[in-house]
Structures are given as structure tokens and as C-alpha cells.
Amino acid sequence: MDVAEMHLGESGYLGVSLEEVTREVGVSKPALYYHFPQGKEQLFIAIAHRALEHHREGLERAIAAHPSGAAKLRAVARWLMSESNQDHPMDELRDLSRFVSEQHQLELAEAFFGSLYSPIHRAISSAVESGEFSENRPEFLTWAFLSLLSGMLQVNNTPSGPALPQATRTAEGMAEHTVDLFLNGVLP
């Protein structure tokens, strides 16, 4: 699975050849199909589930280590920004739903919801309920937070364009500034 995941990050779903993966791993194609009878689609669904579980565990650890809602969101942002600097092909895994069956699309949506959205939603809901965050719908706040982080991850990974301010060139700096923007807005 590691080799297939590496190829996914390099070539995208359509660019991955199972022959190349089996040759590199040193197994036969029938051996691969024994473990993944539905072939390429099932293999990459398993990789997506593994990556999402990794994200869920990382987010839950980051959240559990902090008492306040603001600190939890800072920890989430730092963890996600640092994970983006590793070789996890999350963009390609997110894109995977375009190429798989409807059943697998539903599975991926449910796994995304449980692994990324739910831990953050629980942290935000708790902060709203305790009065730390203003009265607002936690669902809206969760999607807004995820959207802002996702956008900043894209900016951080874009090779060209205007240079980022020095303070946001590290994962830590980008995380801090993004959460500050979410929590405090742009008004003075």
C-alpha cells in the first residue's frame, strides 16, 4: 500500500499502473488481486481509509492535549499544516471520489466526515456550549474553519504567485495566522 500511495502522490489515480506497483513491490498481479479483488479502486479506497484514520488519530491527539477551544483549533491547524509537508497525497485521495463507484464515494464521504470534520466539530461545539466561542452554529463554524485551512494549505503548496509574508512561511506560522484570522477576523 505504501508504494501505491507514493505513486498516487506522484501520478494521480489515472497515472498509477498496478503492473508498476506489483513490479516494484515484488509480488505478482494475481497476489495483489487476492488481497484487493476489485483491483485498483479497492486498493486506493483502502489507502484512503488508512490515511483518513491517520488523520483522525492525529487530530484527536492534538485536540486532547489542549483545554480551550482556541488552543484546540491552533493544535488542529498546526497538525494539519505539518502533515501537509509530509508525503501524504491528500489532494489525490480527495480527488479519488471522481473515479470510484457510488458505493465507494459514500464510504469516502463518511470516512472524511468521521476523520476530519467530526473531531473538529466536537471541539468547536464544546467551545460554543461553554461560551468561549460566540453563539453560532457549530456546523457552520466547522465548515468555515476547514475551508479556511484548506485554502491556506493550497496557498502554502502553490509553487508560484506572490510571496507569503515571512511569518507564514513555516507550517507553524501559517497555522497560527490562519487560526488568528478565524478567531479574530480582519476587523481591528
Annotate each predicted stretch with a short phrase:
Residues 3-8, 182:
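Short hydrophobic clusters on alpha-helical segments that form packing/core surfaces
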Residues 7, 54, 58, 62, ...:
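Short alpha-helical functional segments enriched in proximate histidine and acidic residues
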Residues 7-42, 46:
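Helix-turn-helix
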Residues 10-14, 66, 87, 130-131:
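Short coil/turn segments at alpha/beta junctions that flank glycine-rich nucleotide-binding fingerprints
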Residues 48-54:
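Short, basic, alpha-helical segments at the C-terminal edge of helix-turn-helix-like DNA-binding modules
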Residues 61-63, 78-85, 94-100, 182-186:
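Helix-loop "lid/cap" segments that line or gate small-molecule binding pockets
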Residues 89-98, 106, 110, 125-180, ...:
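Hydrophobic/aromatic-rich alpha-helical bundle segments in the mid-to-C-terminal region
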